[in-house]
């Protein structure tokens, strides 16, 4: 190693006599140099070493390219540096990141693949484990120069030298194989360790188990077991929508077990979807688990009881929700009516409605609707009494007096008070004037989910909330300028957003607890997020339904913040932030489906005015999954969670997406419209079971839009007069609302600037107009939900 560094002149004089250095030994890292003045030989440190790569660790903790460099450094520093027979210094000041390390391994594999494997096998190691193992076997035999079954640092240094794999390009070298994959720290790589380093895993997953389907019933627990097997299998990692679950510390998915199984303690419809498992470090071998969540049927009938005179028509309707979609059957007094069908007695809307024309006394009975699916059975009774009008039975009296109270009415709040309207006959049942303890009444721009026997309104000028129940009137003090109300049935709470002033400088959120109780009501402020109230722009609480009767969390939107603030509705306290910053999304509006637990977020336009696609947020992991394809606009979700309807006024588009019973969001189909849609309302189909239609109001034109969601069939309902102009209605971007009439409701209401229009949803036409109602832009249905 050192011979070539001593020139012949060191050993022979100019006259051919022996040099003064001929018999002088200077030691490692030094050489003899003749002093021409004295003629004596002197030992000096080597000027340089011959380039040679055989790295060695010094006792000073530094790594030297070879022994010569170590001894030369010892000489130059005047201190003893000995060779350390360990590789610790190989990794000192090592800036090799895991991503760089993976790229190095890929480079080494590709290099040896091209050099030693036949052309027909080139590249096969990328996704073929057998080909990868064959390549790594060839590499191990080559790396293991002394054929002792293991590879040490010296052998790695020779490969580095031969292949030119030093740190010229990357901070990583083959020495990092020892750093990351020498499991027992013996400074050697066994064949198994070499396999692990180069991702040759002797793990197995039978082909018939690559996809596993697990069905669970809502409310039960579920266990997903990873079928990847093998000796020394690394820990199992689980993903949902590309998000690792193991580190999230989720409340309902928090025990992964010794065998790597995924435990869901209480299954809900939000948990449905695909989960994947793989061994840590081996993402290419993964198993997909599809969790299907079944829900037993939950049934409602309408009406619960009715009295009819002979000769008229009677209808009994049934609605059931569940997963899979329930099958319906009817019984009369315990007997199947399927065998009794006739021209007089028919089943309509795919069996969800019993229609009896020209009723007779013998049609009196208890009609039981039965709903069945794979998860269970439910039933409910609708009673029909056929009686002469002269007979004042209790059933007759109850039937005839229904509607004389406050139920099954539209309540319209406007500048001249409140009008209570019965939609069937278009009758104004009552006009509550402002002088009736409601001076200068103005009301919330949108009152959502109002109590069945209770009406909530807000008086902006007096900062009060009115609660009206039959004959009683009470008021609740609120913050100034209340603009949005929402009744959360799950917790019997009313949530209230106030602006503080017209410039929205002092917005607040307040909650009224025990809202339907016979107690003294008052508002409670929610906990400010980040100790700031003045940023609140909006809030969103998912609507409860038949199979989603408990809503745990809501969202708060802050002005100009790319984040959703998650709140616990039970404690009205802040839980966490869901960041939208990666997508530069300032949330504008939100909707939600319980089928998979997805939030759909409409983003505000960017600084150039360009619209952004909606974001999809996973409600299980509280992470953004990504964009909802190229869908833009305000999202609306049908009450059963199976349709997402997005309205983009700028593009004149309504885009409809189905959401399957397994939580799969389908491709959109488009409906082009120039109506400038202001609001949407969903209504159950009168012709098909488990289907919904949607009605849309126009903010600028005099038509309304009807769409059959399953088929995309469109119809226009004309002559609804002009809406209140947007500048005249600053409380909401929806200057013409559209309100439905509950689960079994046939009618919808939408206002114009000076009138109210009632639409017949069964016939898809205008039912009537009620005039002289100026700016009746707050419409609430009170009755059967």
List the model feature ranges, each with a label.
Residues 417-421, 457-464, 503-511, 561-566, ...:
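Structural motif
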Residues 406-408, 447-449, 490-494, 551-553, ...:
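Short coil/turn segments that connect the beta-strands within blades of beta-propeller domains
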Residues 62, 144-148, 184-186:
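Acidic carboxylate motifs that coordinate Ca2+ or other divalent cations, activating on Asp/Glu
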Residues 427-439, 469-476, 518-537, 573-581, ...:
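A short beta-strand motif characteristic of beta-propeller blades
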Residues 412, 451-453, 496, 556, ...:
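Residue position within the beta-strands of beta-propeller blades
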Residues 391-401, 436-447, 477-489, 528-547, ...:
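Repeated scaffold domains used in trafficking and secretory/extracellular systems
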Residues 34-36, 50, 88-143, 153, ...:
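Immunoglobulin-superfamily
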Residues 742-785:
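Blade-level signature of beta-propeller repeat domains, shared across WD40, Kelch, NHL, RCC1
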């Amino acid at each position: 190693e050192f011979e070539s560094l001593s020139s012949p002149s060191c050993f022979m004089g100019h006259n051919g006599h022996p040099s003064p250095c001929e018999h002088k030994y200077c030691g490692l890292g030094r050489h003899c140099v003749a002093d021409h003045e004295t003629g004596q030989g002197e030992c000096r440190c080597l000027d340089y070493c011959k380039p040679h790569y055989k790295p060695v660790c010094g006792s000073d903790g530094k790594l030297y390219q070879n022994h010569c460099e170590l001894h030369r450094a010892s000489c130059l520093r005047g201190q003893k540096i000995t060779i350390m027979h360990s590789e610790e210094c190989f990794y000192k000041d090592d800036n090799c990141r895991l991503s760089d390390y993976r790229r190095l391994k890929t480079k080494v594999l590709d290099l040896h693949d091209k050099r030693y494997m036949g052309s027909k096998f080139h590249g096969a190691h990328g996704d073929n484990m057998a080909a990868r193992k064959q390549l790594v076997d060839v590499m191990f035999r080559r790396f293991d120069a002394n054929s002792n079954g293991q590879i040490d640092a010296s052998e790695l240094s020779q490969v580095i030298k031969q292949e030119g794999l030093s740190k010229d390009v990357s901070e990583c070298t083959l020495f990092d194989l020892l750093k990351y994959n020498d499991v027992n720290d013996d400074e050697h790589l066994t064949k198994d360790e070499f396999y692990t380093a180069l991702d040759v895993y002797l793990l197995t997953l039978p082909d018939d188990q690559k996809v596993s389907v697990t069905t669970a019933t809502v409310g039960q627990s579920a266990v997903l077991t990873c079928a990847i097997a093998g000796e020394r299998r690394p820990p199992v990692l689980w993903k949902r929508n590309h998000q690792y679950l193991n580190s999230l510390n989720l409340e309902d998915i928090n025990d992964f077990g010794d065998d790597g199984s995924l435990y869901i303690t209480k299954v809900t419809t939000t948990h449905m979807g695909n989960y994947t498992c793989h061994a840590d470090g081996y993402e290419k071998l993964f198993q997909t688990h599809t969790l299907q969540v079944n829900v037993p049927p939950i049934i409602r009938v309408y009406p619960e009881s009715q009295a009819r005179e002979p000769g008229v028509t009677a209808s009994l309707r049934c609605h059931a929700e569940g997963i899979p979609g329930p099958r319906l059957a009817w019984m009369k007094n315990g007997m199947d009516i399927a065998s009794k069908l006739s021209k007089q007695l028919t089943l309509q809307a795919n069996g969800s409605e019993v229609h009896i024309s020209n009723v007779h006394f013998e049609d009196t009975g208890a009609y039981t609707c039965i709903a069945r699916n794979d998860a269970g059975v439910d039933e409910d009774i609708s009673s029909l009494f056929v009686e002469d009008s002269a007979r004042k039975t209790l059933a007759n009296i109850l039937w005839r007096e229904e509607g004389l109270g406050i139920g099954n009415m539209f309540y319209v709040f406007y500048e001249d008070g409140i009008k209570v309207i019965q939609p069937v006959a278009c009758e104004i049942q009552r006009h509550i004037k402002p002088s009736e303890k409601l001076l200068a009444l103005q009301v919330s721009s949108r009152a959502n989910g109002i109590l069945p026997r209770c009406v909530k309104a807000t008086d902006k000028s007096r900062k009060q909330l009115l609660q009206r129940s039959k004959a009683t009137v009470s008021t609740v003090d609120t913050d100034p300028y209340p603009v949005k109300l929402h009744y959360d049935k799950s917790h019997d709470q009313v949530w209230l957003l106030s602006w503080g002033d017209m410039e929205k400088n002092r917005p607040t959120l307040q909650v009224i607890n025990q809202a339907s109780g016979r107690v003294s009501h008052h508002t409670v402020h929610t906990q400010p997020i980040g100790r700031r109230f003045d940023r609140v722009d909006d809030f969103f609480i998912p609507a409860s339904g038949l199979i989603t009767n408990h809503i745990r969390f809501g969202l708060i939107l802050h002005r100009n913040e790319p984040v959703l603030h998650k709140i616990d509705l039970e404690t009205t306290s802040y839980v966490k932030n869901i960041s939208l910053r990666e997508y530069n999304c300032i949330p504008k509006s939100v909707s939600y489906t319980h089928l998979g637990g997805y939030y759909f977020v409409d983003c505000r336009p960017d600084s150039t005015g360009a619209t952004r696609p909606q974001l999809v947020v996973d409600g299980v992991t509280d992470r953004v999954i990504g964009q909802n394809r190229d869908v833009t606009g305000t999202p609306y979700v049908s009450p059963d969670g199976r349709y997402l309807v997005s309205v983009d006024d700028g593009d004149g588009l309504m885009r409809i997406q189905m959401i399957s019973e397994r939580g799969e969001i389908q491709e959109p189909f488009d409906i082009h419209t120039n109506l400038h849609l202001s609001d949407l309302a969903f209504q159950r189909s009168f012709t098909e079971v488990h289907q919904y239609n949607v009605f849309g109001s126009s903010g600028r034109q005099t038509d309304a839009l009807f769409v059959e969601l399953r088929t995309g069939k469109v119809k226009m309902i004309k002559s609804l007069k002009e809406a209140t102009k947007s500048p005249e209605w600053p409380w909401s971007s929806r200057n013409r609302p559209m309100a439905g009439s509950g689960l079994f409701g046939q009618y919808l209401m939408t206002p114009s600037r000076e009138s109210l229009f009632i639409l017949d949803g069964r016939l898809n036409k205008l039912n009537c107009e009620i005039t002289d109602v100026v700016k009746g832009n707050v419409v609430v249905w009170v009755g059967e939900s």
